């Protein structure tokens, strides 16, 4: 609004339509008093609405100053905001924010890792479609190299697998293909990990 107001200042449109006293600026909503994220891992926030109309929620992940990995779920159908503790006392580093993936069965899978000091990723999966307040137990994906900045996705041409990108092998972009979770929410790396790019 401020940019629009500055661009219209002095014009007849601004004088007739807006005045500083009447202009409204959206201040935003605070998600967390002590939450942070970095832009290297995505999606840090996700909105999912299904075709049947039973799910319409947004998920925003962050890590707090005490190292707790958290997320806020806003359910637009119920008008309810819920803060979810994903993992406590993890590592107080804004590079450890969680990322989100909606699975084909509409459950939400959350990935997170420490900042490069463990060769693994952690994940949890909602037990109810679209509802991260129902997270299952923490699981681990072991790797042999550095892990940080998980970025999961599912390709429309390959809906039977999860692709996970991260900063890994020799600190370079790395990719692996995972199976979809089984009945115990376990996944397996069935291709990779491979380094995607060599920087100089």
Residue ranges and their predicted role:
Residues 1-9:
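Bacterial N-terminal signal peptides
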Residues 10-15:
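Signal peptide processing junction and immediate N-terminal pro/mature segment
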Residues 16-200:
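Extracellular, repeat-based ectodomains that mediate carbohydrate processing or recognition
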């Amino acid at each position: 609004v401020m940019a629009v107001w500055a661009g219209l200042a002095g014009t007849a449109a601004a004088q007739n339509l807006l005045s500083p006293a009447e202009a409204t600026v959206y201040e935003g909503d605070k998600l967390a008093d002590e939450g942070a994220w970095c832009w290297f891992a995505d999606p840090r926030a996700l909105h999912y609405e299904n075709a049947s109309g039973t799910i319409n929620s947004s998920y925003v992940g962050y890590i707090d100053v005490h190292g707790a990995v958290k997320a806020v779920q806003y359910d637009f159908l119920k008008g309810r905001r819920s803060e979810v503790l994903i993992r406590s006392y993890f590592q107080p580093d804004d590079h450890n924010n969680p990322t989100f993936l909606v699975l084909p069965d509409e459950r939400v899978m959350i990935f997170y890792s420490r900042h490069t000091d463990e060769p693994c990723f952690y994940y949890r999966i909602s037990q109810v479609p679209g509802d991260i307040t129902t997270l299952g137990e923490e699981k681990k994906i072991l790797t042999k190299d550095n892990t940080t900045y998980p970025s999961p996705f599912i390709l429309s041409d390959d809906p039977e697998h999860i692709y996970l990108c991260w900063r890994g092998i020799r600190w370079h972009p790395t990719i692996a293909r995972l199976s979809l979770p089984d009945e115990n929410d376990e996944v397996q790396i069935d291709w990779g990990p491979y380094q995607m790019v060599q920087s100089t």
